[in-house]
């Protein structure tokens, strides 16, 4: 079986390509810069550039919120042409953020990743559309490297038009003449000159009589705002720059595609659209009209290209050099004007390059914060491919045809793994064997079947459609198996059944077509694709548990997924372990002693805990590549996202209806689903107009128990247990004392009690809702240079221990997700015939309608593996060997477990896979046999502690005066129209009035409630309209509609007019 390529290899190879080739290409484009008098010339000598190794380590960059980058130095020379003197210096250009071996960059202490973008490849594309009369109109679209799309079309009268915008079109002879070709040259270089001669009349012939007339006509149509332009060299240059260079630049890939599609041989360095290209495009377009040639499929991957991290970084580097060029030009002119002697050091600043990359990593849509929920998430994030981003599509305008699966995706883009929601089909994931080729195409490996050579070849999408490719045959696992006579195959985007002798290529691996997430689902062939999609997404949301456990039933890729994620500590040299603890491992070998630091309670950006545990004892000899310590969610070097728990599929008093899950309290007391979460809180100190803010533990008017954990500096002590509302950092902000700002009662009390007006306002960092835990790290980052614009920052990290509770979300690996609805005592849970209580009870109705039967196979095989102490690794699509192959695998294992453990209930022939179980409350058996087994269940990041919320008081919206929405804003829950109907249905008049007035948007009633609460007494009823009604009246007035409303007195039924 061939080795699977590294899952992070695509990102890292792209960055290496940028360092090796992209930097040099862009530096060679840097022009020689002269002053206005052409006496001084500045130039870069790009042959001798160098990147300096960073002074800090990755871990320190994350901890101190710095950028892990390398300094770029280039030799530059300043030449005085009068004396022919040259001054050469090595200058600092700027910092380039580096990428680690996992494909991540660290910018301002945050792990970031640049995902690959799929764009339409530049070139020429032919398509046919029906007009309003039902007649086919053939068009040829020239897609440039920068996204411009000029079109050529031929109508039913065989007239050829050039269309640059949707509304305007012009005869093809005009742009051809404007590009420098006269009518005679055009007719000599086309295959159908009679068509070109048939449609121009005398007026049009005059327009193309000379290049000047053609340029004027073209400029009138597309670039002129008004009036009659006059031909000039500046107008010609402007048209050349705005249209023929910016909108018609093909680029390196576009020139290659154009030459292949039109069968021409223009040199690769001619990256702009030439008159010869236009004439060849028109020839093919006329041939399409006459039924010759084939139309292009725009959604085929051969017509797409990958814009990788190398391309994006190279574009940003080129942009930075353009900014540097403008800065150097301005500095030279300023130095000459002020009669100063410039040097290369004085001319060049590092600001353009540094700020360009900071802006790119911080603001570009394709640069994203690395999702580090668990190890699987980290490697999957780097293999995403997106149609979105600059130059791409948007979620609201993309059609269904673009989102759909295309036959060319086979083995390149996973047909299952995509995002859900508005971006479905637009954000995909690369297949595990796919790689990005030199020309930006996605290549897939195949095993070549011939007598001369039997080797693996990587083919781009434009080549494999010419071969007969065997799809899913027994040779995909073992080359020695006898070939079948007739096999399913793929040829020219069609799936056929042909003889084995006609096969050219075959697949190399059963997982070749899937992404990493889909490849970790056992028995995936028995699941509906929608549920497999949910499963591959939910595995990325699994929380690393405090006690991880390997899955009993897996697919075999768990080891490589854990290895490539980089969370485990790997021995880089062979040697002997001489010391080990929770902080480091010391290795002795080759006369050197190496100390390997371990990650201890590091926070991910999803607040999960990244921690490494040593696996090697002291005195053990190890080899290179051996695992020294397991990381988060890994055991023995294999991915371990969940737990193997005993599940039963049966209803239980309605507590597991509609995807609810019933669990045993053993999962809590045994710390089965306990996870650690780390939250970071920070506060800054600024210099205000009244003076600097102070960090202190002397906070007036605060209760002592809130300050109990502060040290003498006013910062919480390490190891303290913190509850909601406690002070983490004590801070006072100076303010001007104004007696007039206080209420009269407040001033009277201050005068009686002798309390002085405070000159400082308390602005402490307090622990918000749901943040209780243990302080594990406190860091005070001092400002450098004493600048008031660079404030001091204090960071406090708090560790939380979370057991599973009601409201948490759990899921299996087959899209079977649910919310914990009730936690039963273990004695009340249903129990097996040997007395073992089950851990979870799932609803059986969730299986048949969702068609994810793979969980049944996993459940039964997991029970057999648990009893036999075995682990299984199942390849997908085993049904291709024989029918019912999965069932024939599971049932013998259950039978073997039943015999070895002398438990006949494990496999009962009447209902294999099911068993009679008993009600824990009564001891009576249930009426029907129940499917029981060991399933691998994950605890997801959607936890009730992060979501539950109640509002007592909070902020209100300025316009509607209604409570804000959302937990972060202390918002409330909206009582809408249907909720009011429900309240009315129960006849709760007072509750309805409260919801619509006091607790919502009645300003005066809210104030009266506050007063009545303080003084005592009954709360008065609101008499006027709430603010939302007044807002409606004002909006109607803005539309010149007056709405009057009246309140009728209950006593005398008189109308009392109230203004809105």
Swiss-Prot record:
Q: Which domain of life is it from?
A: Eukaryota
Q: List GO molecular-function terms, semicolon-separated.
A: DNA binding; DNA-directed RNA polymerase activity; ribonucleoside binding
Q: Which SUPFAM superfamilies match?
A: beta and beta-prime subunits of DNA dependent RNA-polymerase
Describe the reaction catalysed, as an equation: RNA(n) + a ribonucleoside 5'-triphosphate = RNA(n+1) + diphosphate
Q: Which GO terms describe its cellular component?
A: chloroplast; DNA-directed RNA polymerase complex; mitochondrion
**Where does the record say this protein resides?**
Plastid, Chloroplast
Q: What class of enzyme is it?
A: transferase
Question: Its principal location?
Answer: plastid
Enzyme Commission number(s) from the entry? 2.7.7.6
Keyword Nucleus recorded: no
Q: Which GO terms describe its biological process?
A: DNA-templated transcription
For this UniProt record, the keywords arranged alphabetically read as follows: Chloroplast, DNA-directed RNA polymerase, Nucleotidyltransferase, Plastid, Transcription, Transferase
Matching PROSITE patterns: RNA_POL_BETA (PS01166)
Q: Which residues form the signal peptide?
A: none
Q: Its function?
A: DNA-dependent RNA polymerase catalyzes the transcription of DNA into RNA using the four ribonucleoside triphosphates as substrates.
Q: Which family does it belong to?
A: Belongs to the RNA polymerase beta chain family.
Q: How does it assemble?
A: In plastids the minimal PEP RNA polymerase catalytic core is composed of four subunits: alpha, beta, beta', and beta''. When a (nuclear-encoded) sigma factor is associated with the core the holoenzyme is formed, which can initiate transcription.
What name is this protein filed under? DNA-directed RNA polymerase subunit beta
Q: Which gene encodes it?
A: rpoB
């Amino acid at each position: 079986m061939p080795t699977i390529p590294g899952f992070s290899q695509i990102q890292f190879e792209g960055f290496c390509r940028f360092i090796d080739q992209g930097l040099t290409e862009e530096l060679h484009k840097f022009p020689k810069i002269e002053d206005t008098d052409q006496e001084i010339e500045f130039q870069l000598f790009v042959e001798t550039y160098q990147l300096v190794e960073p002074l800090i380590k990755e871990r320190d960059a994350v901890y101190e919120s710095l950028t892990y980058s390398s300094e770029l130095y280039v030799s530059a020379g300043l030449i005085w042409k009068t004396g022919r003197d040259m001054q050469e210096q090595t200058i600092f250009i700027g910092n380039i953020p580096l990428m680690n071996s996992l494909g991540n960059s660290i910018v301002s202490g945050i792990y970031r990743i640049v995902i690959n973008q799929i764009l339409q490849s530049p070139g020429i594309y032919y398509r046919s559309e029906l007009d309003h009369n039902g007649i086919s109109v053939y068009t040829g679209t020239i897609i440039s490297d920068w996204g411009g799309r000029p079109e050529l079309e031929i109508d039913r009268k065989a007239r050829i038009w050039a269309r640059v915008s949707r509304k305007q079109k012009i005869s093809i002879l005009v742009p051809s003449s404007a590009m420098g070709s006269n009518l005679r040259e055009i007719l000599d270089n086309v295959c159908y000159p009679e068509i070109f001669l048939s449609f121009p009349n005398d007026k049009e012939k005059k327009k193309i009589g000379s290049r000047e007339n053609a340029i004027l006509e073209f400029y009138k149509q597309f670039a002129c705002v008004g009036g009659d332009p006059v031909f000039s060299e500046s107008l010609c240059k402007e048209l050349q720059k705005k249209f023929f260079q910016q909108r018609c630049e093909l680029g390196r890939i576009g020139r290659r595609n154009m030459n292949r599609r039109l069968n021409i041989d223009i040199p690769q360095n001619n990256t702009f659209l030439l008159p010869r290209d236009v004439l060849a495009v028109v020839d093919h377009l006329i041939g399409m009209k006459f039924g010759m040639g084939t139309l292009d499929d725009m959604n085929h991957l051969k017509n797409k290209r990958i814009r990788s991290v190398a391309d994006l970084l190279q574009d940003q580097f080129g942009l930075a050099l353009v900014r540097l060029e403008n800065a150097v030009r301005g500095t030279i002119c300023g130095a000459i004007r002020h009669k100063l002697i410039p040097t290369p050091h004085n001319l060049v600043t590092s600001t353009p390059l540094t700020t360009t990359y900071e802006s790119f990593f911080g603001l570009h849509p394709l640069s994203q914060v690395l999702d580090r929920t668990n190890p699987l998430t980290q490697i999957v994030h780097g293999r995403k491919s997106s149609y979105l981003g600059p130059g791409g599509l948007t979620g609201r305008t993309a059609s269904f045809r673009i989102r759909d699966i295309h036959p060319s995706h086979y083995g390149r883009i996973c047909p299952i793994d995509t995002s859900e929601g508005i971006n479905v089909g637009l954000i995909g994931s690369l297949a595990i064997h796919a790689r990005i080729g030199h020309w930006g195409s996605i290549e897939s490996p195949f095993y070549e079947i011939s007598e001369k050579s039997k080797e693996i070849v990587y083919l781009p999408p434009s080549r494999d459609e010419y071969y007969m490719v065997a799809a899913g045959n027994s040779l995909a696992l073992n080359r020695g198996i006898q070939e079948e006579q007739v096999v399913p195959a793929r040829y020219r985007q069609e799936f056929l059944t042909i003889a084995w002798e006609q096969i050219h290529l075959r697949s190399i691996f059963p997982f070749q077509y899937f992404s990493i997430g889909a490849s970790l689902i056992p028995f995936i062939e028995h699941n509906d694709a929608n549920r497999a999609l949910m499963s591959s997404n939910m595995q990325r949301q699994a929380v690393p548990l405090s006690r991880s456990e390997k899955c009993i039933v897996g697919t075999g890729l768990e080891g490589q997924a854990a290895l490539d994620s980089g969370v485990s500590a790997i021995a880089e040299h062979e040697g002997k372990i001489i010391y080990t603890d929770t902080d480091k491992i010391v290795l002795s070998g080759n006369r050197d002693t190496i100390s390997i630091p371990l990650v201890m309670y590091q926070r991910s950006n999803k607040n999960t805990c990244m921690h490494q545990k040593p696996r090697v004892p002291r005195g053990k000899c190890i080899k290179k590549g051996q695992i020294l310590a397991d990381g988060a969610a890994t055991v023995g070097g294999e991915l371990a996202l969940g737990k193997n728990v005993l599940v039963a599929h049966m209803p239980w008093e309605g507590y597991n209806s509609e995807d609810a899950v019933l669990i045993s309290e053993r999962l809590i007391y045994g710390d089965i689903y306990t996870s650690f979460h780390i939250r970071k809180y920070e506060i800054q100190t600024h210099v205000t107009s009244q003076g600097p803010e102070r960090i202190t533990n002397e906070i007036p008017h605060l209760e002592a128990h809130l300050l109990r954990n502060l040290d003498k500096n006013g910062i919480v002590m390490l190891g303290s247990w913190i509850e909601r509302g406690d002070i983490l950092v004590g801070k006072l902000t100076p303010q001007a004392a104004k007696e007039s700002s206080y209420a009269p009662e407040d001033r009277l009390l201050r005068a009686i009690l002798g309390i002085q007006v405070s000159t400082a306002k308390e602005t402490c960092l307090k622990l918000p809702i749901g943040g209780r835990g243990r302080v594990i790290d406190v860091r005070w980052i001092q400002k450098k240079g004493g600048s008031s614009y660079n404030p001091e920052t204090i960071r406090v990290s708090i560790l939380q221990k979370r057991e599973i509770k009601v409201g948490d979300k759990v899921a299996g690996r087959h899209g079977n997700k649910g919310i914990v609805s009730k936690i039963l005592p273990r004695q009340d849970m249903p129990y097996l015939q040997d007395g073992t209580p089950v851990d979870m009870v799932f609803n059986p109705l969730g299986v048949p309608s969702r068609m994810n039967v793979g969980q049944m196979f996993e459940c039964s095989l997991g029970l057999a593996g648990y009893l036999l102490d075995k682990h299984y690794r199942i390849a997908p699509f085993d049904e291709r060997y024989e029918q019912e192959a999965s069932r024939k695998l599971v049932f013998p294992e259950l039978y073997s477990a039943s015999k070895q453990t002398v438990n006949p209930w494990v496999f009962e022939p009447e209902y294999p896979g099911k068993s009679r179980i008993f009600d824990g409350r009564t001891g009576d058996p249930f009426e029907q046999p129940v499917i029981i087994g060991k399933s691998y269940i994950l605890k997801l990041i959607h936890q009730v502690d992060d979501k539950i919320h109640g509002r007592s008081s909070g902020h209100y919206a300025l316009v509607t005066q209604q409570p804000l929405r959302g937990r972060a804003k202390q918002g409330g829950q909206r009582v809408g129209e249907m909720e009011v109907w429900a309240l009315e249905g129960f006849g709760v008049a007072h509750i309805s009035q409260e919801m619509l007035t006091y607790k919502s948007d009645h300003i005066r009633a809210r104030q009266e409630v506050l007063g009545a609460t303080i003084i005592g007494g009954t709360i008065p009823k609101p008499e006027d309209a709430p603010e939302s009604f007044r807002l409606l009246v004002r909006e109607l007035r803005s539309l010149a509609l007056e709405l009057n409303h009246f309140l009728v007195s209950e006593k005398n039924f008189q109308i009392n007019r109230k203004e809105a």
